[in-house]
Swiss-Prot record:
MF terms (GO), sorted A to Z: unfolded protein binding
UniProt-listed PANTHER family: PROTEIN-EXPORT PROTEIN SECB, PTHR36918
Entry GO CC: cytoplasm
Functional description taken from the UniProt entry: One of the proteins required for the normal export of preproteins out of the cell cytoplasm. It is a molecular chaperone that binds to a subset of precursor proteins, maintaining them in a translocation-competent state. It also specifically binds to its receptor SecA.
Gene of this entry: secB
Stated family: Belongs to the SecB family.
Protein name, UniProt field: Protein-export protein SecB
Location (main, coarse): cytoplasm
Protein source organism: Rickettsia typhi (strain ATCC VR-144 / Wilmington)
A GO BP annotation: protein folding
Keyword line: Chaperone, Cytoplasm, Protein transport, Translocation, Transport
Lineage: Bacteria, Pseudomonadati, Pseudomonadota, Alphaproteobacteria, Rickettsiales
Keyword hit for Transport: yes
Assembly and oligomerization: Homotetramer, a dimer of dimers. One homotetramer interacts with 1 SecA dimer.
């Protein structure tokens, strides 16, 4: 049996997830039940994603919030609109503050995204549609794009 030296493990840099939660969830199914009969073709999905980061204290606690909105349409109807604000509280332990922006913008959103994706898939399925399976998101590419836009 191996033992872990607690003094060493506490000095190791790591991210602690203290909580994950739905802040806001809305699903509109405005054309039901007519829209449910018109599912013979794949709908067009318009997806938007935003990340909000809030410093909760001086002790490196942060809330990272994913704001995801998806609107599904076909030729006749707006099939559904779903909006989800899903957040996590993260504690960045023994991590240099210069690394905080990339961790909070890339790694933390990537940790909670699968849970938000599952909620959206379940809600759209419960609304009578095929579950909306959002493709994986490259948060690193989004971060670098945002940083290059700020530099210009």
């Amino acid at each position: 049996m191996s033992t872990i030296n607690s003094d060493t493990s506490e000095a190791m840099p790591h991210i602690s997830v203290n909580a994950q939660y739905i802040k806001d969830l809305s699903l509109e199914n405005p054309s039901a039940p007519s829209s449910l009969a018109a599912l013979d073709q794949r709908p067009q999905i318009d997806l938007s994603l935003d990340i909000n980061i809030t410093n909760l204290s001086d002790e490196n606690f942060y809330e990272v919030e994913l704001n995801i909105e998806a609107i599904a349409r076909n030729e006749k109807y707006k099939l559904f609109q779903i909006e989800l604000k899903y957040a996590g509280v993260f504690n960045l332990i023994n991590i240099d503050s210069e690394q905080h922006p990339i961790l909070l913008s890339v790694h933390c959103p990537a940790m909670i995204f699968p849970f938000a994706r599952k909620i959206i898939a379940s809600c759209t399925q419960d609304a009578g549609f095929q579950p909306l399976m959002i493709d994986p998101i490259d948060f690193g590419a989004l971060y670098h794009k945002k940083m290059s836009e700020h530099q210009n």
